[in-house]
Amino acid sequence: MKQNYFYKSRHELILSPSEEESSPYLHRFSHQLPTELIQSFGPTHISLPFPLHLSILLQEKHVMTAKTEIGWLHQGIEKAFESVPWKMAPSFATRINPIVPAPIALGFVLSLEKILHIDEKIPKLAQDYRLLMLECARIFHHLRIIHQTVALIAPYALIQFSAHTLSQAKELQTSINYDQNNYPRWEIGGITHPIYQTWIREFQKTANATSKAVHLLKRSVLEESQIQKRLTGIGVINKENALSFGITGPCLRACGIGDDLRKSHPYFNYFSYAPTIFTQKDGDAWSRFKIRLNEIEASFNIVQKIIHALLQEIKNADLISIPNMFEQGDAHSVPPGMETSHIESPEGELAITIVSNGKDVPYRVRIRTPSFFNAAAISAFLKNADIDDIVLIILSLGITGLEVDR
């Protein structure tokens, strides 16, 4: 008869009464039983936010080490840029993050405008509209991470409410574009279509309704003790390790370092709106969760300021974009040069370097995504964690798979 037995530690077996009676000799060999186990996790798992393979060394239920293997979504997109015409390249760049494509697309546009020496000539109306897209992308991305976390550990009613709030944020993001997953309103030199007061008023109503829903969600989430209990003390990293891994964004600010490119190196028209920077000291998943909640409300404050500015600018605006060579056709060469733009995406610093050799396609494109550095630090975040907390910790990092596997 097959006997099933389990053990708590090297010297303690958990046996049924019949096993205790029939197999006393097992105690003599208990010191030979293994206490460590290598568990393979991924690359495809229903609870993982993106394809990722983890080789985890477990001691009982605790993670001792975790080796990360990426590349399951590899696109070779940086090499593919070398055959994409300049005018199509910003839209092509959105494949790196199709969930919130505005930062990557506008970062590419900014680098290209620097090569063309038109980055300081962009009309203020167009710059403010670009900021509106970036802040709506930040709101949707953070709400998406919050909903995925709440869906794992919160009561059913709160899960439904967070899903409804997320759908409102998606509608807000979609309303500033002509489709859900691309951004056809922007172009090199400005934006493509004029903006009307009637549209601004409708967008303002949608933003106000979403802001109220987010405020209620934040209050409900902070009052739910179960969420705080599960997230507090897991996935901890100190500021020294965070800096050594190159981590930026909410994960770095959760360690107490208030670094944000919107304030330290403002681009477009951010210097007019002075975004609020939130920090925490504990560096755990709960700290990252609270920072996202606070940044959503701060983004809504910026959105309201931009709306009021747009209503004034529409009356006096003569240009929504400056004339440039890309308006005359698709196949145009760009002067030789190399420029880099830095954007504060929802997860941290996004840097895009473009090299032109004077032809009609890029010579070289190099993209620094924050998710890649967060994924590289997964082993540090998981060290000494409980096996039940692995998915929650990875979710708290806000990693986008396609940003990792470029």
Model regions: which residues?
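Active-site bordering "gate/hinge" segments
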Residues: 2-406
